[in-house]
Amino acid sequence: DTFLHCCIESRGCQFSRKCGSCIMCDYGEGRNLHPDELRKELDERVSQYMNGLHTILIGTYGSIFDEDEISSACFDVILEFLAQYSIPTVIFETHCSTVNSNKLKKIRDKIPRKTKVIIEMGYESCDAYVLKYCLNKFISLEQLKNAIKLIHDYRMSACTNVLLGAPFLCERDQLDTAVKSVNWAFEQGADSVVVFPMNIKPFTLLYKLY
């Protein structure tokens, strides 16, 4: 199966701008695109890969549903672009706090019903201590549960990302918290879970500590 990850430039994650990024994140910041500019980029750079594609993941430097990164007009451009192609699976990557009925309804109205739509959300761990003190991750687990339910209300699939190898923990605790987090996500109704091994990337706080 062919897979394409399309990362759209943006001003960056709202949490990184306001209170510091997750300890392992190297997404950085860019600039927001004008709708006409985005349309041109999609047509010139992405369309060549669309025919015969099985899965496309649409993301940004932060959250695709965050209108401080991707304006409503730009989001419409993305949906109009995707609607031109018969792609079996479309994935939108976003923070759970940005999941709302307006965005999900737009997707349902634009994307063909036969297309499987997945909303992918990074939550990393169900352990509040790990989130706050090991990762500097700003997320409400209650908000994540509500997002999963809302996604299902619009007949879409919810995917959560779990981190394996949280810093400042011994190996046993790293494994235990990852297993607990996978199980917790499924208990809340997640349709799938992606486990990401910790990647020590340059220009991150984790890299400096390492």
Sequence positions of predicted segments:
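Surface-exposed, active-site-proximal loop segments in enzymatic domains
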Residues: 129-135, 172-173, 204-210
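Core AdoMet radical
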Residues: 26-41, 45, 49-70, 82-100, ...
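Acidic (Asp/Glu)-rich catalytic clusters
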Residues: 45-51, 78-85, 105-116, 148-155, ...
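Conserved C-terminal portion of the radical SAM core fold
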Residues: 142-204
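Extended, folded domain segments that form the structural surfaces/walls around functional sites
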Residues: 22, 97-113, 128-147, 152-154, ...
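Canonical Radical SAM [4Fe-4S] cluster-binding loop centered on the CxxxCxxC motif
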Residues: 1-40
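Residues at the starts of beta-strands that form the adenosine-phosphate
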Residues: 21, 55, 89, 157-159
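Distinct, well-ordered alpha-helical segments
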Residues: 68-76, 100-111, 172
